[in-house]
């Protein structure tokens, strides 16, 4: 009995800690529980179950506890999650399986087979413990309410037969199919005859013919039956031997072919993946089947005819065998960030070839049973349709589009390389004894295959592909969202002339543009010409890259238009290339009937992106985009007119009075219309939609209309709107907006017309920023400026610092509709998206009103910038929690407009609305009077007299020497480009990109054009060329211009562009001047009377430190107090005012740290530009002088970007396919440390220092001085924290020496720089001042008595009085002699009986006066106030 029990136990799920087995109760042996199955969780160790005596089946111990049996008239289904069995009614398909169930434990007994009967009425309830299983919702409860009751979902619900039966059945099937698979012995004929059968076709034919003739002769001659029997036996033996030979020959040929070298070496198997997929499938197939069945039921319910009341699945399972990846082939890379692979897949639930023994025991075939209920009234009938033995196989091509942003795969495109093979056993009438498979009908299989091919051909059959945007899916964007917009500009067409001389006329023509039968626009009609010129731009919304753009040429000479010819544009090629400009041929009946010249540009949809931390990055705001509309339910239409069930209504949707979609359905009140469409909108602030309802019987007049302005519709998103005719009748309208960055030819001019001024932001510092990094490090903050969800400017980041100091100047263009701008602190991430640390809003209108008080001359003579510092509170975007403070000062200047032919009414309207939004637009006289002092129109010659202004460059096209490069445009020493074009796919790309840059000094400004390899991280420069901005403005102002960029091979790359210059009346802050940056040529000559470092002598060498970082190191002169070096180096100086150049003389020691012999600071401001200065630099030691020659050469040296991603990708989008509108120039747009290059904190692993690639010089050392972007520590000067010094700005008028005209000489500019710095800051006095230090109020202190101890550099300690927490207030002055930059140690202690306990300690070191909060431990902090004496 024990052995029998062990054989009967077969786990359903193998390789798991708990499996399910089915065994008959022991009471069934005695006839008390016949037919009942007892289901219990058991262990995978079969031996422990096998040794259990039969008498303990009803009462198990330990963890093996069985549930008491229940009475059932049908089949029990065991729930593997809850551990319970539920009764299931018997169906015709399940009754047969019940009759074949053998009780486990006595499977060999014939008596037990008779126990499967209906004698289970009086079943005793055996004693035993109930199974305690985790609770979970049953699968049936998740089915839709309209589904068929007790529907069978998933393979686990199907599996209810005995394991032994299933195993024996498939073993018999395999043995029957493989009866001769290993046969090697000779046949009977081969044993007793020398004749060998080779399996040729004529041998089989001869055997059949001989058997037929001999049988006929035997019957004709009336022989006995045994003669006929002998003939049949002999023929069978011979034929069997022949078939064995056939199989043997086939195997030999297969082995012969397999022995050959396989040509498909690129294909790989995916056994490991199939193993994982099988395990995943076994666990999740029920949920997958439930989800699929539910969605399919809901989909087909919308299309059911009226006589079909319900269609639901009674059984749905895809089988227990998972789909398989048979093999995979990955293509060699042909495009950047694209992976292409071919996959052979199959779904064969009824195939056991590759199923292991454990999976075979619980194998369930696919089974889908759809029950359709039809009829009328009480006469309802059910019609079951059963689909089983589903088989699907095919070849799939998958194209992965990779991305550097999360989820790192942008798009996944799928395409069938050939029509997939589909077969299934479909029975319209599911009767067990009637095999009514529709595939038995001749030709039906081929018909289904052909129809499937026709269906897939236009959707996913190669080269058509089904595209899925994974990043959009992660961001919650619904599938089916438009891919983008195609701007199609049709220039002209050509038609073949009529050969018939009797027709003496010229035709009238027009062209239509359609996709999938929907017309998007048409050109004007051009009459009496064979070569019509249209110059018309049509915008087409692209919903799928598989739908070609159809251009149709019509002849409008007759009463109705006649089709002349058609041509097609592939949107997928356009999507990949970005631009197509060509001449296509019109064809009619495969005959060339004309041509069309066009330019097509693809503008992708701007979709939100989801980051790895779960936050969502919204796309930039744009007035151009795609409006997606879905018309929902219409309610109470009977309030408007009399309608019956036979009435048919037509719903028409208009966008800006143009019909875009319509739908006609039968009238049913409160029924969804389900009319979905989209349309391209040029300006969402001025557009509107209209819905009209027509009765089909009287379509001339609408019975109901409703109009909704687009801003209101987009603001609501989904709302109910009332019809105009009767407010009781309503319609539900759902809409969402997809912005698209469409760049038109007039976009640059439109941008200039809307540009009213510039905001100067001096981002000084931030305090108490939140830490979003791990506890072992701190955030890497930077600040960025956001206008309308677009990042238009940013600073460099400060590594590992929660109190960063930037002192950077950013220039932000202000448009007519700009009300506020956001200043946001971000944490820089080397990989992934940066994280927000908090943001603050700045009201632009306040500064515009301040600028209105000054006329043009006053604006031009006033230094651009203020001394007012605003400490803005940073808050989180979610929850509005405080995240720290950021200190900035702001100023605004208007722009002056050039006097052009359309100079304009719109410009003055935009300026008026920007300068005073409360003034009515119709009051033009008042508007002009108020704004004439701010913004006026000047001539081109007058514009060139202004040294500062905005330069807008429009890149039109290029002639390149190579493909795969992009164009980047820089201004002056900008770290980041203000224009970045898409990667050129051809040698003649048409980019249509533009960007705007702030030019501070037109006389000295330079514009650099750079061709790179297009990499976002560390792009490789192919070639570059710099031109004077003044020459560029003079030559290209308002007209096309070509810039030549020499290549590495000597050939020229031509870039065609135009430029617009808008002056800004201002006096430039001298710190931002060209004269303040450049290259320092340092000639180290000799030293005299150096101090003695070792015994009687020294081994001196000299190190130059720029902002604390080594910029030059001389050689070591051994044992000499008067060394001679004669070494030279060039050092890049980005800011003479803030950069600190220190000379340090060391004594070299072997194996030890060098000793300092003396130091001295070199005053960079005292150097005259381009003048050699011979200096004897005295060391701070008792003796020692260093003789050196210094020459400062002003110039622009581009800084190296600290971020590894091109900053233009985050800027305001203004060009197609990634070309961004940015604010460039020195100090503009991004990361340009104009006023604080040297004060951005210590350089960590993320920082990029140096600009060695952009510096040239002579001598042994060409040193990069851009290490001013470096740690300052003790070199932080008062300029960084003192607004009046760091910004060097005042509201008073600058002196005449500071007002530098365009043609100023460098020497006089240097004098102006020095003079202004001395006047505005008083630098000598600043260093001599002393300050008072106060201890203010504590915060988040413990509830104890606390005192503060302050220790200075001399280790002198000062204690405050004791105060009670948690918010003690001291307000005590600390009698310490302290200067800016000195360190103070602040510690908090509590007193107790045993002494003092230190709560925490912090180092206080600041370079400015004001109130600061010092964190001394955990969240505890104390205010430290610094005042000047």
UniProtKB/Swiss-Prot annotation:
Domain (C2): residue spans on this chain: 462-584, 738-858, 1060-1177
Read off the Pfam families from this record: C2, C2_TCB1
- Where does the record place it? Membrane
Keyword Transferase annotated: no
Q: What's one GO-annotated cellular component?
A: endoplasmic reticulum
Q: Which PROSITE patterns match?
A: C2 (PS50004), SMP (PS51847)
Q: Where is the composition biased (Polar residues)?
A: 109-121
An annotated GO BP: endoplasmic reticulum membrane organization
> Which parts of the sequence are annotated with region: Disordered?
1-76, 103-130, 899-932, 1280-1303
Entry GO MF terms: lipid binding; phospholipid binding; protein-membrane adaptor activity
Keywords (A to Z) from UniProt: Lipid transport, Lipid-binding, Membrane, Repeat, Transmembrane, Transmembrane helix, Transport
According to Swiss-Prot or TrEMBL, what is its membrane topology? Multi-pass membrane protein
Membrane spanning segments where? 197-217, 225-245
Q: Where is the composition biased (Low complexity)?
A: 14-29, 1294-1303
Q: Tell me where in this chain the SMP-LTD domain is found.
A: 266-471
Where is this protein primarily located? membrane
The protein's name? Uncharacterized protein C962.01
């Amino acid at each position: 009995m024990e052995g029998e029990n062990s054989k009967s136990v077969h786990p359903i799920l193998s390789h798991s800690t708990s499996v399910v087995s089915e065994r008959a109760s022991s009471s069934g042996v005695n006839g008390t529980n016949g037919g009942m199955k007892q289901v219990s969780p058991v262990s995978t160790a079969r031996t422990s179950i096998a040794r259990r005596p039969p008498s303990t089946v009803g009462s198990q111990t330990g963890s093996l506890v069985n549930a008491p049996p229940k009475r059932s008239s049908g089949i029990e289904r065991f729930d593997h999650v809850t551990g319970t069995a539920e009764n299931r009614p018997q169906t015709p398909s399940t009754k047969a399986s019940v009759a074949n169930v053998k009780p486990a434990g006595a499977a060999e007994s014939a008596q037990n087979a008779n126990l499967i009967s209906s004698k289970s009425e009086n079943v005793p309830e055996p004693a035993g413990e109930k199974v305690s299983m985790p609770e979970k919702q049953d699968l049936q409860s998740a089915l839709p309410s309209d589904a068929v009751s007790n529907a069978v979902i998933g393979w686990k619900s199907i599996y209810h037969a005995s394991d032994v039966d299933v195993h024996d059945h498939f073993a018999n099937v395999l043995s029957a199919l493989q009866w001769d698979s290993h046969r090697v012995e000779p046949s009977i004929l081969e044993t007793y005859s020398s004749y060998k059968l080779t399996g040729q076709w004529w041998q089989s034919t001869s055997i059949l013919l001989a058997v037929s003739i001999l049988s006929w002769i035997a019957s004709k001659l009336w022989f006995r039956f045994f003669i006929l029997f002998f003939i049949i036996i002999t023929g069978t033996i011979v034929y069997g031997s022949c078939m064995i030979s056939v199989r043997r020959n086939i195997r030999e040929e297969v082995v012969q072919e397999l022995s050959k070298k396989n040509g498909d070496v690129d294909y790989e198997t995916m056994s490991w993946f199939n193993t994982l997929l099988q395990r995943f499938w076994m666990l999740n197939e029920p949920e997958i089947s439930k989800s699929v069945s539910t969605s399919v039921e809901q989909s087909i319910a919308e299309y059911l005819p009226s006589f079909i009341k319900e269609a639901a699945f009674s059984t749905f399972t895809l089988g227990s065998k998972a789909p398989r990846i048979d093999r995979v082939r990955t293509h060699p890379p042909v495009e950047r960030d694209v992976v292409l692979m071919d996959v052979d897949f199959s779904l064969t639930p009824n195939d056991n070839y590759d199923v292991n023994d454990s999976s075979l025991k619980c194998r369930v075939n696919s089974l889908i049973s759809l029950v359709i209920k039809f009829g009328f009234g009480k006469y309802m009938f059910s019609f079951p349709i059963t689909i089983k033995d589903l088989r699907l196989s095919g070849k799939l091509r998958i194209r992965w589009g990779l991305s550097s942003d999360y989820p790192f795969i942008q798009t996944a495109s799928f395409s069938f390389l050939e029509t997939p093979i589909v077969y299934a056993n479909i029975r319209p009438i599911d009767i067990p004894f009637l095999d009514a498979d529709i595939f038995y009908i001749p030709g039906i299989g081929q018909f289904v295959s052909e129809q499937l091919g026709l269906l897939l051909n236009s959707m996913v059959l190669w080269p058509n592909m089904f595209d899925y945007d994974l990043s959009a899916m992660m961001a919650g964007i619904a599938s089916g969202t438009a891919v983008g917009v195609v701007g199609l500009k049709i220039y002209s067409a050509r038609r073949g002339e009529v050969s018939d001389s009797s027709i003496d006329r010229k035709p009238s023509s027009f062209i239509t543009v359609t996709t999938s039968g929907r017309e998007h626009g048409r050109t004007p009609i051009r009459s009496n010409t064979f070569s019509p010129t249209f110059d018309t731009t049509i915008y087409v919304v692209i919903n799928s890259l598989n739908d070609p753009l159809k251009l149709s040429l019509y002849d409008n000479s007759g009463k109705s238009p006649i089709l002349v010819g058609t041509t097609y544009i592939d949107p997928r090629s356009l999507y990949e290339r970005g631009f197509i400009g060509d001449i296509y041929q019109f064809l009619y009946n495969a005959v060339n009937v004309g041509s069309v010249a066009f330019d097509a540009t693809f503008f992708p949809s701007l979709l939100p992106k989801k980051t790895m931390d779960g936050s969502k990055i919204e796309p930039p705001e744009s007035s151009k985009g795609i409006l997606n509309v879905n018309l929902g339910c219409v309610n109470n239409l009977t309030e408007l007119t009399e309608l019956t069930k036979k009435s048919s209504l037509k719903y028409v949707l208009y966008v800006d009075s143009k019909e875009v979609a319509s739908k006609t359905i039968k009238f049913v009140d409160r029924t969804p219309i389900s009319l979905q469409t989209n349309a391209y909108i040029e300006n969402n602030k001025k557009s509107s939609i209209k819905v009209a309802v027509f009765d089909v019987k009287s379509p001339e007049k609408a019975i109901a209309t409703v109009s909704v302005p687009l801003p209101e519709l987009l603001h609501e998103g989904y709302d109910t709107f009332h019809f105009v005719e009767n407010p009781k009748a309503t319609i539900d309208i759902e809409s969402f907006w997809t912005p698209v960055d469409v760049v038109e030819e007039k976009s640059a001019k439109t941008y200039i017309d809307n540009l009213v001024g510039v905001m100067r932001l001096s981002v000084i510092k931030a305090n108490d920023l939140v830490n979003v990094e791990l506890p072992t490090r701190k955030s890497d903050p930077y600040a960025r400026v956001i206008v309308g969800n677009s990042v238009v400017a940013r600073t460099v980041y400060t590594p590992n610092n929660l109190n960063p100091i930037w002192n950077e100047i950013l220039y932000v263009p202000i448009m007519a509709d700009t009300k506020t701008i956001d200043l946001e602190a971000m944490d820089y991430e080397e990989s992934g998206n940066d994280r927000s640390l908090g943001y603050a809003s700045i009201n632009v209108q306040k500064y515009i009103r301040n600028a209105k008080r000054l006329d043009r001359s006053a604006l031009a003579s006033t230094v651009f910038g203020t001394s007012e510092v605003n400490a803005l509170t940073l808050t989180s975007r979610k929850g509005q929690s405080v995240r720290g403070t950021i200190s900035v000062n702001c100023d605004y200047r208007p722009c002056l407009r050039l006097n052009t032919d359309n100079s304009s009414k719109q410009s003055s309207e935009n300026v008026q609305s920007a300068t005073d939004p409360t003034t009515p637009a119709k009051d033009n006289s008042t508007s002009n009077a108020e704004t004439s002092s701010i913004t006026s129109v000047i001539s081109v010659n007058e514009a060139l007299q202004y040294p500062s202004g905005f330069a807008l460059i429009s890149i039109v096209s290029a002639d390149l020497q190579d493909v795969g490069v992009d164009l980047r445009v820089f201004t002056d020493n900008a770290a980041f480009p203000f224009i970045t074009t898409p990667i050129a796919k051809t040698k003649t790309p048409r980019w249509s990109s533009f960007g705007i840059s702030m030019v501070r000094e037109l006389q000295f400004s330079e514009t650099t054009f750079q061709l790179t390899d297009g990499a976002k991280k560390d792009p490789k420069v192919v070639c570059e060329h710099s031109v004077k901005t003044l020459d560029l403005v003079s030559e290209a102002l308002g007209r096309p211009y070509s810039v030549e960029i020499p290549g590495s091979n000597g050939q020229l790359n031509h870039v065609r562009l135009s430029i617009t210059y808008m002056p800004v009346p201002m006096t430039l802050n001298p710190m931002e001047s060209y004269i303040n940056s450049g290259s320092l040529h340092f000639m180290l000559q000799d030293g005299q009377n150096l101090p003695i470092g070792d015994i009687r002598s020294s081994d001196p060498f000299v190190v130059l430190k720029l902002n604390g970082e080594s910029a030059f190191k001389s050689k070591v002169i051994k044992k000499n107090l008067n060394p001679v070096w004669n070494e030279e180096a060039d050092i890049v100086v980005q800011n003479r005012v803030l950069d600190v150049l220190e000379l340090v003389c060391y004594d070299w020691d072997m194996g030890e740290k060098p000793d300092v012999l003396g130091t001295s600071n070199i005053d960079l401001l005292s150097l005259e530009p381009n003048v050699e200065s011979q200096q004897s630099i005295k060391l701070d030691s008792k003796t020692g002088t260093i003789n050196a020659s210094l020459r400062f050469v002003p110039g622009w040296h581009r800084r190296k970007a600290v971020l590894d991603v091109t900053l233009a990708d985050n800027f305001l989008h203004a060009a197609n396919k990634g070309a961004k509108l940015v604010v460039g120039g020195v100090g503009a747009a991004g990361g340009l440390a104009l006023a604080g290059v040297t004060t951005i904190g210590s350089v960590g692993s993320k920082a990029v220092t140096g600009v060695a690639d952009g510096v040239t010089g002579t001598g042994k050392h060409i040193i990069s001085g851009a290490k001013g972007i470096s740690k300052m520590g003790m070199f932080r000067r008062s300029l960084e924290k003192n607004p009046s010094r760091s910004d060097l700005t005042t509201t008073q008028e600058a002196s005449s020496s500071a007002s530098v005209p365009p043609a100023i000489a460098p020497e006089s500019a240097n004098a102006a720089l020095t003079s202004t710095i001395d006047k505005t800051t008083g630098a000598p006095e600043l260093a001599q001042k002393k300050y008072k230090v106060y201890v203010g109020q504590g915060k988040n202190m413990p509830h104890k008595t606390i005192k503060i101890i302050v220790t200075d550099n001399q280790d002198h300690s000062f204690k405050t009085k004791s105060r009670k927490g948690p918010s003690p207030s001291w307000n005590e002055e600390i009698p310490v002699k302290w200067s800016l930059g000195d360190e103070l140690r602040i510690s908090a202690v509590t007193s107790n009986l045993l002494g003092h306990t230190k709560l925490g300690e912090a180092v206080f070191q600041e370079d400015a006066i004001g109130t600061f909060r010092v964190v001394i431990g955990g969240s505890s902090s104390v205010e430290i106030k610094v005042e000047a004496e």
